[in-house]
Design a protein with these regions (language model features):
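Cytochrome P450 C-terminal beta-domain/meander region
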Residues: 74, 80, 300-308, 361-378, ...
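Conserved cytochrome P450 K-helix/beta-meander segment immediately N-terminal to the heme-binding cysteine loop
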Residues: 414-454
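N-terminal membrane-proximal hinge/A-helix region immediately C-terminal to the signal-anchor transmembrane segment
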Residues: 2-134, 149, 156-161, 198, ...
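Cytochrome P450 heme-binding "Cys pocket" and the immediately downstream C-terminal segment
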Residues: 167-168, 340-342, 459-460, 473, ...
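C-terminal, well-structured subdomains that either form a transmembrane helix-short loop-helix hairpin
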Residues: 309, 313-316, 322-323, 400-405, ...
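Cytochrome P450 heme-thiolate monooxygenase catalytic core
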Residues: 107-116, 150-329, 345
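Cytochrome P450 I-helix active-site segment
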Residues: 48, 152, 156, 175-185, ...
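Short, small-residue alpha-helix embedded
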Residues: 324-337, 487
C-alpha cells in the first residue's frame, strides 16, 4: 500500500513536471519564433513587444496606449511592430491603404471581444463585409438628411437645458460636484461631465425613446462611467483575445467585466421597454433612431433587424453618438479658453451671423460659419474620440501598406492620436490653430507665422481621420457635426467664457486623454457669464 502510494505520488509529480517542461518549451519556442522567424521580424519596434502581446496589453490596461504608440513612432519611424502580430503605420498613405475602399483588409479578431451576445454583431463590430454592408444599408436610413432634420428638436431641447444649467437658472439639480462653484454672476462647470450628460440625454432619447435626464437629475449619471468601463473591457480583451475567448476577464479584470455586464443589462431593459412602447404607439411613434431601426429594411433583401440586432445597434449608436461629441466639445472649450484670440474670433463670427439664440439651428447659415467648423476640426485633431489604432487584418494574398508587404493574417492600424500630430501633415502640430483648416488664413505659432495654402489644407485633410475613413467610417458623422455645431455656437452666442483652473491639462498643456478605446477625460473647468 505504502509503495503504491509512493509510486502514485511519483507518477503525479512526473506528470506535473512533464507538463511544466512542455509549457516552458512551448513558451520558449513561441518567443524564439516571434524574435527570429516571424515574417514581421524585420519591422522595427521594441524587442520585448515583438515577443509578447502583453506589452501592448499593459498599455491598454494603463490607458496610455495612444501615447505609447506616439513615442514608438517618434523613435522607430513610420512602421512599428508594437506586438508580435500588430504593425502600427503612421502615414497618410498607410491610413488609406489600411482603411480605404477596395482594400484587402477586414476588421480584426479584436472586434470579437465586443458583442454582448456571442454571434450577434452590429454595424460597429461586424467583421464579415457582406454582413456589415447589409446592416449599414438598414442603418443609413436613420441618418439621411431628412431623418436628422426631424430629430433636431430633441437635440435642441437638451441643448437648451444645458444652457440653463450654465446660466445658473433654477429648476435643475443644484447638487454640483465639489470642483464646481456658483459666484456672483458666474458659474464654474466641469464641461467634460456636462457635455457627457448632454450627449447621453440626446442619444438616450433618440435611441431608446426616453432621455436619461442627466442634465436635470443625478439619478442615472452613473451610466456614463458604466459605458466607459464597458468600452475599456472590450478594448483590453481585444488586445489579448484569451481574456475574452477563455473567459479570463472574469478572473483578471473582474470589476471591469461586472461593470460591462451592468451596462448591458441596463441597456437591454431600456431597449425592451422602448420596443414595447413603439409597438403600442404604431403610426403615432415619433421618428427617432429607434423608429427607423424598427421599421427600416435592407433595400436589397427586404429584411429588417432582429430583436437582438435592434438592441445591439441601439447600444452602439448611443455609445458612439455620445463619446465622440462630448469629447470634441470638451476639447473645443479646453483650447478656446486657453486661446483668447481664437475664442474672440469664434464669438465674433457667431454673434455676427445671428441676432437671437433660437436662430441657431442646423442648416445653411450655420454651415457657412467657417471658423466654427475649423475650431471643431482642430479639436477633433488634437483630442480624437478614438485615439488609438483601430486594427484591421490582412486578408488572403497579403497587402502592401505604404510600401511594406504584410502577409495574410497580420493585424495593422494607424493610430489617430499619432498621425494627427505628424509635422509632415500639420505644421506646428502641437499648437491649437483653427486657421490651419482655412485657406488664406494666417497661422501664428510660438516660433513661426505663415499663410495657410490650399496644398496645406489638402495635406491636412488626407491625414485627418477622427471618424475613421473608407467603408467602415462612422455612419453618424453628420449627426455628430450637427450637434457639435449647434451646441458650440449657442454657448458662444450666450456666454462669455474663461479658464477656471488647470483641471484636465497634461504636462504639455493639452487635454489629457485616457485611452479606453474611446477617450476618457476630466475637464475642462470653465467659467460662464451670461451676456
Amino acid at each position: 500500500m505504502f509503495v503504491a502510494s509512493v509510486l502514485e505520488c511519483l507518477s503525479l509529480t512526473g506528470v506535473a513536471c512533464g507538463l511544466g517542461v512542455l509549457l516552458v518549451a512551448a513558451t520558449l519556442g513561441y518567443v524564439i519564433y516571434n524574435a527570429f522567424f516571424h515574417p514581421l521580424r524585420r519591422i522595427p519596434g521594441p524587442f520585448l513587444a515583438s515577443l509578447t502581446p502583453w506589452v501592448q496589453l499593459y498599455h491598454g490596461l494603463k490607458g496610455d496606449r495612444h501615447l505609447w504608440l506616439y513615442e514608438l513612432h517618434t523613435q522607430y519611424g513610420s512602421h512599428v511592430r508594437a506586438a508580435p502580430n500588430f504593425i502600427s503605420v503612421n502615414t497618410d498613405r498607410g491610413l488609406h491603404d489600411i482603411y480605404g475602399h477596395g482594400k484587402r483588409l477586414q476588421k480584426a479578431d479584436f472586434y470579437n471581444a465586443f458583442p454582448a451576445i456571442k454571434g450577434v454583431y452590429n454595424t460597429h463590430n461586424a467583421i464579415d463585409k457582406t454582413m456589415h454592408g447589409r446592416k449599414r444599408r438598414v442603418l443609413s436610413q436613420a441618418f439621411s438628411d431628412h431623418a436628422l432634420k426631424g430629430m433636431e428638436d430633441v437635440m435642441l431641447l437638451h441643448v437648451r437645458q444645458l444652457c440653463a444649467v450654465l446660466a445658473g437658472h433654477d429648476g435643475v439639480d443644484s447638487d454640483w460636484d465639489d470642483l464646481e462653484e456658483e459666484t456672483k454672476g458666474a458659474v464654474v462647470r466641469n464641461m467634460g461631465d456636462w457635455f457627457s450628460y448632454l450627449t447621453y440625454d440626446v442619444m438616450g432619447e433618440l435611441c431608446f425613446g426616453k432621455s436619461f435626464d442627466m442634465l436635470v437629475s443625478r439619478g442615472k449619471r452613473h451610466m456614463v462611467k458604466l459605458v466607459d468601463r464597458a468600452a475599456n473591457r472590450h478594448y483590453v480583451c481585444g488586445l489579448w483575445m484569451p481574456l475574452d475567448s477563455w473567459h479570463l476577464d472574469q478572473i483578471f479584470i473582474r470589476q471591469l467585466t461586472r461593470d460591462r455586464w451592468n451596462f448591458i443589462m441596463n441597456s437591454r431593459v431600456e431597449a425592451s421597454a422602448r420596443a414595447k412602447e413603439r409597438a403600442q404607439a404604431g403610426r403615432e411613434a415619433k421618428k427617432d433612431f429607434f423608429y427607423y431601426l424598427l421599421n427600416a429594411t435592407d433595400p436589397e433583401t427586404g429584411k429588417g433587424l432582429s430583436t437582438p440586432e435592434l438592441w445591439g445597434e441601439a447600444n452602439v449608436l448611443m455609445i458612439a453618438g455620445s463619446d465622440t461629441t462630448s469629447t470634441t466639445l470638451a476639447a473645443a472649450l479646453f483650447y478656446l479658453v486657453r486661446r483668447p484670440g481664437a475664442l474672440s474670433k469664434l464669438s465674433a463670427e457667431v454673434r455676427g451671423a445671428f441676432n437671437e439664440v433660437e436662430e441657431i439651428v442646423s442648416g445653411a447659415r450655420l454651415n457657412e460659419l467657417v471658423y466654427l467648423k475649423a475650431v471643431i476640426d482642430e479639436a477633433l485633431r488634437l483630442a480624437p474620440a478614438v485615439p488609438g489604432a483601430i486594427p484591421r487584418e490582412v486578408m488572403d494574398g497579403g497587402a502592401v501598406v505604404d510600401g511594406v508587404f504584410l502577409p495574410a493574417g497580420t493585424n495593422c492600424g494607424t493610430p489617430t492620436y499619432s498621425i494627427h500630430r505628424q509635422e509632415a501633415y500639420y505644421r506646428a502640430a502641437g499648437t491649437f490653430l483653427p486657421e490651419r483648416w482655412i485657406e488664406g488664413a494666417t497661422c501664428e505659432a510660438a516660433d513661426a507665422k505663415w499663410t495657410t495654402s490650399k496644398e496645406q489644407v489638402d495635406t491636412a485633410r488626407r491625414a485627418f481621420c477622427p471618424f475613421s475613413i473608407g467603408p467602415r467610417g462612422c455612419i453618424g458623422k453628420s449627426m455628430a457635426f450637427m450637434e457639435m455645431r449647434v451646441t458650440l455656437a449657442r454657448l458662444v452666442f450666450l456666454f462669455e467664457m474663461a479658464l477656471a483652473d488647470r483641471v484636465g491639462e497634461d504636462e504639455q498643456g493639452h487635454l489629457a486623454l485616457v485611452d479606453h478605446f474611446t477617450s476618457a477625460k476630466n475637464g475642462p473647468n470653465v467659467v460662464f457669464r451670461h451676456r
